[in-house]
């Protein structure tokens, strides 16, 4: 009987600890979200993506439509996160994708962000037309971190499912050259490591 009581007591203690840990995690999430909201950008912002051996791609970002996405992207750029990374996935007629520190589509930054698109409960009227910049993600709507893609040809079927956050204002000829010159190793657009175009820097203009 005594052994059974001890066993029940240990189970109850374990359950209480589990609940307290969950409460701590929820509190931390709430504090992080509040902090993010307090520091979100607004308005239009501009960045230049310099690609080694190709040139500059100038992009206008819309923080009024996608404040979480733009703020995250600009913070990473200002921290130098993208410097030296690559475009690891290229599909001519669709898009070029980069921003993965592992260079294989599985990596990202330490921070995952809310997916700002309609099928995730957030209004976003930016369309995935030629020149759009948008966040790559996994099947989890809130899994985007650092990987982004630039649309090569109109792909409006992506609207509502991916967080478009701006458009190329100058340099689509660079995207055209990358799509024309870089050959993928499979139908998924995988580019061999030694052939991946290098992002020298993403400079934040304003």
Task: Go through the PLM ranges and name each one.
Residues 5-12, 18-206:
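Cyclophilin-like peptidyl-prolyl cis-trans isomerases
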